[in-house]
Amino acid sequence: RPPGSEFGTYYWNENGERVTDNLEGDDSRVMMDRVIPFIEKAAQREQPFLAVVWFGSPHRPHRAAGRFRKMYSDQPKHMRDFYGEITGMDYAVGKLRRGLRELDMHEDTVLWYCSDNGGLKNESSGGRGRKGQIYEGGLRVPALLEWPGNIDGGRTTEGPGVTSDIYPTLLDL
């Protein structure tokens, strides 16, 4: 199978064409290598943009980039890839934040980072259930919201949230 198609999933560009190049390695890098140029084009045209980036990491099959896997050489192999994917995703989010600063767009750009589901089996999200279940523990998601020019940092809320809250919250901003 070609890279990126392990689950019958493929990458597509903005023209609806299947992408087949630059798919080797960590999924987070693959995604960010496409998002940054998209944002740069919007900046050149001085147009608002919406970029929704759904990272496949960290999901099975876990395949971290070598440099991130090496950081966890003291761990069992399956955990090296798992932790390496998380590190790769962190690096990709950092690359996005740096890119926004370099384009002088960070003050006017809402960056919303959240999970797609609740916690794993051995974790507690403060509610009944876990990932894959329709109880609060499977639906409640951790999230970070950053909008430097408009929202003061350092605030937290204990209010529950789900991914379906994103759209109405953005409209309310």
Protein language model regions, located:
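Formylglycine-dependent
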Residues: R1-F49, F55-G66
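Short glycine/proline-rich turn/loop motifs
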Residues: Y11-T20, K70-H78, E146-I151
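Short, solvent-exposed loop/helix junctions and linker helices
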Residues: G25-R29, Y83, T157-P160, S164
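A structural signal for well-ordered alpha-helical scaffolds and beta->alpha junctions
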Residues: S28, M32, M89, G137, ...
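A long, amphipathic alpha-helix that forms part
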Residues: R29-A43, F68-T109
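Structural recognition of the beta-strand scaffold that forms the well-ordered cores
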Residues: F49-W54, T87, V110-C114, A143-E146, ...
